[in-house]
């Protein structure tokens, strides 16, 4: 969350600006925009990938649009090449939200390397964890320097206890960093282990009655296998299944709720009904 906020501030996002976000994501994505007093514009999702729907973006772009935040949901990469083409044509920043997708790739190119900035989460349930905290990447040294200044109270690196701007206390502790670095040393092994589990689930669930969709599988993408996802037929009660799994010691959870259905975020969509995100939330 702080990484998203920091990148937005470093890019100069402010009151009066608009930032396009997908309707299905953890609330941190839209909250970071609101922290900047900017206006989030909620976008429909793709029915297959559950990521931001590229075909819906153009109609949401206005003269006030300054950034798009694609979220690689549950480790599934967005259609980044198409999105980058739109953003470059309109001179709009792209901030990749890779909170759930460290290790995911498109044609062997890692997510987080397409946009102007990208953010990663090291929360306790993530593939790499430091308990809390995250990471931000930048492809512009000037923006990187600004973010580095802002994360440490805006304190000048040339004059001790001199503050050129109002900054934040967004520093990761050395202990947290050490925990994260130790995991990065066996990163490939961690991903491989998770993908083995995914393959096991795929074999067990493939063709089973009541399961409409397994995690998307495409030759040109690598899913980092963060969370295994299922779409259930409407005759299966999702919440009852979650409770039955819990009784068996198996943790499961519903998908994220549609942002535009929740009180703090109503009014940030240009459409009355976002059919794909509404359907996913209910399944």
Where are these regions (language model features)?
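Short, conserved alpha-helix that lines the donor NDP-sugar binding/gating region
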Residues: 4-8
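PLP-dependent aminotransferase-like
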Residues: 9-98, 105
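Conserved active-site segment immediately N-terminal to the catalytic lysine
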Residues: 96-130, 159-164
